[in-house]
Amino acid sequence: MATYVMSDLHGDYNGYKSILKQITFNESDTLYINGDVLDRGSYGLKILLDMMLKPNIYPIFGNHEYAAYQCLKFLMEEVTEDNIEKLDAGFLEGLLEWQSIGGQTTIDEFHKLNHDERQSILDYLEEFSLFETITVAGNDFVIVHAGLDNFNKSRPLEDYELHELIFRSPDYDKIYFDDKYLVTGHLPTRVIDKNPKPDHIYIKNNHIALDCGAGFGGQVGCICLDNFEEFYSKDI
């Protein structure tokens, strides 16, 4: 019975399954997936379809899920004059921006699903949380996809807006909480300044950064919060 977190799978189904095998994931365990399951790689929706069968996997919203949800909702609709009118400049700009960050692979995969599978994907995305706060083995953790933009120690987590949680990474040189760990993804650890091990989990200043670059030729990383053991989908 253990608690794990992984993040930024970006369609790497084999990496996802490799981690589950390594940790011998079972019904007594808990796994948090900290956003950006989708895009860049080809099998993000395949991962979601597997995740939704496992009630002990808890998904957290990332910026790629946000972009996908806005556009996939429209792709589910029958094309009529009324909803064609919804294609304003803002929507088209959002679609193009999503495609520019790897969304085309998700669109292609979505088109291959049947109607029920597509609807189940949209329903599942609506269940994603914005953050999680948990205690494991006496340590407290805040799990959020990108960070806590406009951070203030006295500000309740519930007061943060969506855009403050999924777009901007924290300052990894700064301690945000003296008494808990801030667990994030979003920013590949290879670009964290002075990180001695690119594409590996970065732990410093009460931060745990989990994006090991799966969307950019790196790997999927996973950490066990009970003992801080690390697992990787590749031997980099």
Language-model-derived ranges and their functions:
Residues 5, 31-33, 59-60, 142, ...:
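Residue-level marker for buried hydrophobic side chains located in beta-strands
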Residues 97-209, 213-218, 228-229, 233-234:
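Acidic, His/Gly-enriched loop-helix segments that form or flank divalent-metal centers
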